[in-house]
Amino acid sequence: FRGRDAAAKASGLVGLTDRRGCCSHPACNVDHPEICG
């Protein structure tokens, strides 16, 4: 499950509390499609 592994790594970098903020920024959203879906 590479997608899930990528999501785990992304959430580690971005932080679960920052996910919504990341997804509101186009650059971060593009870098983390697995968490912004």
From Swiss-Prot:
InterPro entries: Conotoxin_a-typ (IPR009958), Conotoxin_a-typ_CS (IPR018072). Pfam families: Toxin_8 (PF07365). Residues 1-20 form a propeptide. It comes from the Eukaryota. Signal peptide: none annotated. It is found in: Secreted. Disulfide bonds join 22-28, 23-36. GO terms for cellular component: extracellular region; host cell postsynaptic membrane. Expressed by the venom duct. GO terms for molecular function: acetylcholine receptor inhibitor activity; ion channel regulator activity; toxin activity. Negative results: does not block alpha-9-alpha-10/CHRNA9-CHRNA10, alpha-2-beta-2/CHRNA2-CHRNB2, alpha-2-beta-4/CHRNA2-CHRNB4, alpha-3-beta-4/CHRNA3-CHRNB4, alpha-4-beta-2/CHRNA4-CHRNB2, alpha-4-beta-4/CHRNA4-CHRNB4, alpha-6/alpha-3-beta-2-beta-3 (CHRNA6/CHRNA3-CHRNB2-CHRNB3), alpha-6-beta-4/CHRNA6-CHRNB4, and alpha-1-beta-1-epsilon-delta/CHRNA1-CHRNB1-CHRNE-CHRND. Belongs to the conotoxin A superfamily. This is Alpha-conotoxin LvIA. It comes from Conus lividus (Livid cone). The lineage of its organism: Eukaryota, Metazoa, Spiralia, Lophotrochozoa, Mollusca.
